């Protein structure tokens, strides 16, 4: 607005955002309903400072489904088409397990996460993250003697083999992925587990390598769960990428002023990032949503990002 010579106060802009989020909340709720019907959900969380909030540390949680890329229109009518791309943010005043349980509402599908214990208290089947496990060994590698290879190098190289398999089977169907993982990745995982068990007895438990080994062993059942279903991923990078736009934004605006503002941010970020994940221009999509929602339609499914037909703009 300022570039067009229109001066708007911070209060006015904030009020507009709050009102806009209220209008878009029905879309958010419908996306939430559909997300809980999916077989796999990825989740992550990040701190958020809220000035007028009793809690010293609040959090923005993210939950996402879908392949992390715009849908292929050629597969729109296929029975095995990928699940819808949905990215939803959920503002909470804590990082407790109750936050996850409230959002998931008894969801019993697969939940792919890092090793944070709050997720353990859900009804979901947890899937681990090899990217997190690998980072522990990268940290251990940094404290090795310079110029010498050690245990961390072996694990990093071994995990790299697992990722190369994933790159090679990326375009396969879920059924093909499952079969190929069991054929090619399972033997490598068995080797890794044997190495971890043996090495855990050879290193100081409080050393960097000892902590890395202990983390992988604690997470092992979750780490190898991606073998069970071809729809699962080897890591939780899907959620980490989904929460990154919010983290980048937070570096610019630093905090939310009120809990109402934080909740509005959750709705607005959700609509914007879900639009982007489905190949839509957020501004055009939100403009269309506001125009159509003003008509108070009986159903809003035709307005969801993978169903909507945006009007052509004539210049």
PLM features: residue spans?
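Catalytic center-proximal scaffold of phosphoryl-transfer enzymes
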Residues: 1-315
């Amino acid at each position: 607005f300022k570039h067009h010579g229109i001066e708007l106060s911070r209060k006015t802009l904030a009020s507009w955002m709050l009102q806009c989020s209220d209008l878009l909340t029905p879309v958010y709720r419908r996306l939430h309903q559909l997300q809980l019907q999916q077989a796999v959900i990825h989740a992550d969380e990040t701190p958020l400072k809220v000035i007028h909030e009793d809690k010293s540390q609040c959090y923005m949680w993210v939950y996402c489904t879908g392949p992390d890329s715009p849908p292929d229109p050629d597969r729109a009518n296929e029975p095995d088409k990928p699940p819808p791309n949905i990215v939803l943010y959920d503002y909470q005043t804590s990082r407790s397990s109750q936050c996850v349980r409230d959002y998931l509402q008894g969801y019993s599908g697969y939940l792919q996460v890092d090793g944070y214990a709050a997720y353990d208290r859900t009804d979901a089947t947890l899937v681990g993250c090899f990217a997190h496990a690998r980072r522990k060994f990268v940290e251990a590698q940094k404290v090795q003697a310079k110029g010498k290879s050690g245990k961390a190098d072996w694990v990093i190289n071994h995990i790299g083999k697992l990722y190369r398999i994933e790159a090679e089977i990326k375009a396969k169907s879920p059924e093909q992925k499952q079969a190929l993982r069991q054929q090619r990745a399972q033997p490598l995982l068995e080797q890794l587990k044997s190495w971890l068990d043996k090495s855990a007895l050879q290193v100081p438990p409080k050393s960097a390598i000892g902590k890395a080994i202990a983390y992988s062993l604690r997470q092992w059942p979750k780490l190898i769960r991606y073998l069970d279903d071809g729809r699962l991923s080897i890591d939780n990078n899907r959620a980490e990428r989904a929460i990154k736009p919010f983290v980048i934004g937070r570096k610019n605006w630093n905090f939310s002023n009120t809990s109402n503002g934080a909740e509005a941010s959750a709705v607005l970020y959700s609509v914007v990032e879900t639009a982007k994940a489905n190949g839509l221009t957020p501004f055009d999509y939100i403009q269309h949503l506001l125009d159509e929602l003003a008509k108070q339609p009986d159903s809003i499914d035709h307005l969801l990002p993978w169903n909507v037909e945006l009007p052509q703009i004539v210049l």
